[in-house]
Regions:
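Actinobacteria-biased recognition of intrinsically disordered, low-complexity terminal regions
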Residues: 1-2, 166-169
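AMP-binding/adenylate-forming catalytic domain of the ANL superfamily
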Residues: 18-19, 28-32, 56-78, 134, ...
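A generic structural signal for alpha-helix starts
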Residues: 1-2, 43, 101, 133, ...
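Short, compositionally simple motifs enriched in small residues
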Residues: 129-130, 142, 164
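AMP-binding/adenylate-forming catalytic core of the ANL superfamily
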Residues: 1-58, 109, 140
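Adenylate-forming
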Residues: 1-10, 57-64, 92-96, 124-127, ...
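Acidic/polar alpha-helix N-cap and adjacent early helical turns
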Residues: 1-2, 69-123
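Phosphopantetheine carrier-protein modules
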Residues: 16-24, 28-30, 107-128, 134-135, ...
Length: 169
């Protein structure tokens, strides 16, 4: 089992991270590990989460990374209530595995074209490092896999695996 200090250490070693802290927060009736990261250069939360999963394994336990300007602290430790509110308010996207074959196929295509090991169904295409070139490659792969046309506007407005899978169903 990976510990919170191990997650913090891996995040802190990332070249784009100035400081990182981790905590367990309660969300939808379960405990989830969330990290807060102050950045020295721009990198998205999903990319940092993927970095941790690459270093510590898929079962690292890290559900999400909140990008902060200044580390939220309370009584000398990371402010767990602040992190929990960020998750509740949707400012921190939590990793969620694909739930059916369509989502799994779309996530696998994104993973291959974006060179991201784990793509969650709520991850944003642009936050994963997507650009116009990768969009065209993904669109071509999806058209081939699902045997249906998909235009750029349709793809970009979907923005996540889950929403794109809904369009493809």
């Amino acid at each position: 089992m990976v510990t919170l200090p191990e997650i913090t250490e891996v995040l802190s070693a990332h070249p784009g991270v100035r400081r990182a802290e981790t905590a367990i927060v309660r969300h939808n009736g379960r405990d989830v590990a969330i990290a807060a990261a102050e950045l020295s250069e721009y990198v998205s939360g999903p990319i940092l989460r993927n970095h941790v999963r690459q270093e510590l394994g898929e079962d690292s336990g890290l559900a999400g990374v909140l990008i902060v300007e200044h580390m939220p602290m309370a009584d000398g430790a990371v402010d767990v209530e602040y992190l929990a509110s960020a998750v509740t308010e949707g400012r921190c996207t939590l990793f969620e595995d694909p739930r059916d074959d369509v989502e799994r196929q779309v996530a696998a295509i994104w993973s291959a074209h974006l060179d991201v090991r784990s793509v969650g169904v709520n991850d944003d295409f642009l936050e994963l490092g997507g650009d116009s070139l990768s969009a065209l490659g993904i669109i071509a792969a999806i058209e081939a896999e699902f045997d249906r046309p998909l235009d750029v506007y349709e793809f970009m407005s979907a923005a996540s695996v889950r929403r794109l899978a809904e369009i493809l169903r």
